[in-house]
A protein has these predicted regions:
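C-terminal catalytic "cap/lid" subdomain
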Residues: 2-59, 71-292
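Glycine-rich active-site loop/strand segments that organize a redox cofactor
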Residues: 60-67
Length: 292
């Protein structure tokens, strides 16, 4: 079994239990890829530098970070710091962990979005200067080689963003040449893309037990989603940050992952418990039925 684990970056999430579980899975002979976020660390670093983080709302109602050039520099610094810490933590657990970002080997690759559609004061606008991208390809060969050699990849944004460069900007010949630059992308969706590429089970760890029918009532935990009707109910229940996780779940399942689990990062054994039935389990059949 191959498992992709998304470790969140929220203040309320302690990764210690997840790292121990990764070590247990690797010892059992399972192949594991760890993907981490870090938005909280980015915001904390921006605050120390006296810079206000900027979030924008898309016309579809999704709220996301606007990443200008300065924020992108902070992003690379913060994610690099977190990646090193997680790799060291896993190595302390006896795991041969290797740190990667999405630019390495074009692990996560796709077009850069320099302009985004946003809603400000009720009006739709085009906001330029964004450093973000959409993942179109995952270098599964790179991950497969590392896994087959006994390594545990620890991956994170930024991704390799592609944009055309004209001849006047340094390319030869008449045809534009690709320019690759590091750009921001969502960590949940990065994990989803990797899980889809590897046909792996995806575990999305967060600071709650799973998806609740009533977001304010943990007793309403949705435990299993297998049909299109249950999928529709899941989408309706997911609010705020959880909506982004369900979007990632759909992308993973559509891409080839057999199952996605949304589970509590702060459980005693968060990954092992999730694989054993805790959290919200979404099967590929739910998305396949919904697409028919």
């Amino acid at each position: 079994m191959t498992v992709v684990i998304k470790v969140g970056g929220a203040r309320a999430v302690d990764p210690a239990g997840a790292l121990a579980d990764v070590a247990s899975l690797v010892e059992q002979g399972e192949q594991v890829v760890v993907v981490h976020g870090g938005s909280t660390k980015v915001d904390e670093t921006l605050e120390r530098l006296g810079i206000d983080p900027e979030y924008v709302e898309t016309p579809s109602g999704v709220v996301g970070r606007f990443t200008d050039e300065t924020t992108m520099e902070v992003f690379e610094m913060a994610f690099g710091h977190l990646n090193t810490r997680l790799v060291a933590g896993l190595q302390s657990e006896g795991v041969d962990a290797v740190g990667l970002n999405g630019v390495d080997g074009k692990l996560l690759y796709g077009p850069r979005k320099s302009a985004v559609r946003v809603v400000e004061d009720g009006k739709k606008k085009i906001k330029r200067g964004d450093h973000s991208g959409t993942i179109k390809q995952v270098n599964g060969d790179l991950l497969g080689s590392l896994l087959d050699d006994g390594y545990t990849p620890v991956a994170a944004p930024p991704m390799a963003g592609s944009e055309a460069r004209s001849a006047s900007e340094g390319s030869s010949g008449d045809e534009p040449r690709e320019q690759v630059i590091p750009v921001n992308t969502d960590a949940d969706r990065s994990a989803a893309a990797i899980a889809g590429e590897l046909d792996a089970t995806l575990v999305l760890l967060t600071d709650v037990e799973g998806v609740y029918e009533d977001p304010d009532d943990p007793a309403t935990l949705i435990e299993s989603v297998e049909t299109s009707e249950e999928w529709a109910a899941l989408e309706a229940a997911a609010e705020g940050f959880m909506g982004r996780k369900i979007m990632a779940a759909e992308e993973a399942l559509s891409g080839g992952a057999p199952e996605v689990v949304v589970a509590d990062a702060n459980a005693d054994t968060p990954i092992l418990s999730a694989l054993d039935g805790d959290g919200t389990h979404v099967q590929a059949s739910a998305v396949q039925e919904a697409d028919q």
